[in-house]
């Protein structure tokens, strides 16, 4: 673990390292007297790091992925629920990097329906059949998904070192969009290597 700070000249310093390895031992921010409950949503980080190696992301290649236990997440959600928060934005870089854990998380989220809605970032190329079935059975309105497509050009994704085949991602996106019980948005990223401006507009209209 490193130390991040501003020096006397207000320049950012981190000694080249600022990483929390014992992520599950951090104090819950919701228990702090300084936590800001004035917003209509709360951001919740249940994992830190990412299995993927996307060159455009600061978390790309940050392994191992560190996780909180389901019980620890439940305790935090209980606090959030007691404060009347109805929207939780899960900050995990790839919610379904581990499909078994993703299914356990979805079962946990069910416990808070209809009081809390969850916003997740999901990699559509990694959807297993089991996770698809789980998503299809969730209560109406429990989830709002952001599906990371990033580009409709395979060479752009390969150059950006993003794992997952485009064909699989599009198949997963098609499935997610067919589900009537949740809202799904697809993400594209402008400015990726080899991604020309006209191609971005073509992808938007596809």
Language-model features: locations:
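A general structural signal for short secondary-structure junctions and capping/turn motifs
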Residues: 34, 205-206
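Radical SAM [4Fe-4S] cluster-binding motif and immediate context
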Residues: 28-180, 190
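C-terminal EAL-domain catalytic cores of bacterial cyclic di-GMP phosphodiesterases
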Residues: 185-186
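A short, charged helix-loop
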Residues: 17-33
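Catalytic cores of alpha/beta
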Residues: 131-135, 193-205
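Glycine-rich beta-alpha loop elements in corrinoid/cobalamin-binding modules
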Residues: 1-17
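Conserved beta-strand positions that form and line the central face of beta-propeller blades
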Residues: 14, 25, 159
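A generic secondary-structure signal marking the coil-to-beta-strand transition
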Residues: 2, 11, 22, 40-42, ...
């Amino acid at each position: 673990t490193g130390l991040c700070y501003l020096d006397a000249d207000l320049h950012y310093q981190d000694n080249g390292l600022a990483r929390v390895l014992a992520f599950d031992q951090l104090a819950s921010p919701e228990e702090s007297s300084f936590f800001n409950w004035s917003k209509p949503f709360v951001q919740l980080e249940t994992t830190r790091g990412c299995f993927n190696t996307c060159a455009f992301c600061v978390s790309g290649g940050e392994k191992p992925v560190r996780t909180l236990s389901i019980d620890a997440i439940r305790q935090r959600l209980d606090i959030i629920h007691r404060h009347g928060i109805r929207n939780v934005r899960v900050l995990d870089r790839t919610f379904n990097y581990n499909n078994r854990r993703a299914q356990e998380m979805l079962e946990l989220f069910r416990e808070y329906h209809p009081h809390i809605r969850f916003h997740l970032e999901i990699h559509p190329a990694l959807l297993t059949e089991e996770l698809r079935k789980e998503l299809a059975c969730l209560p109406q309105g429990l989830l709002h998904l952001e599906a990371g497509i990033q580009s409709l050009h395979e060479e752009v994704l390969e150059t950006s070192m993003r794992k997952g085949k485009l064909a699989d991602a599009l198949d997963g996106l098609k499935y997610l969009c067919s589900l009537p019980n949740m809202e799904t948005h697809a993400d594209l990223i402008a400015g990726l290597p080899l991604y020309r401006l006209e191609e971005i507009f073509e992808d938007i209209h596809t």
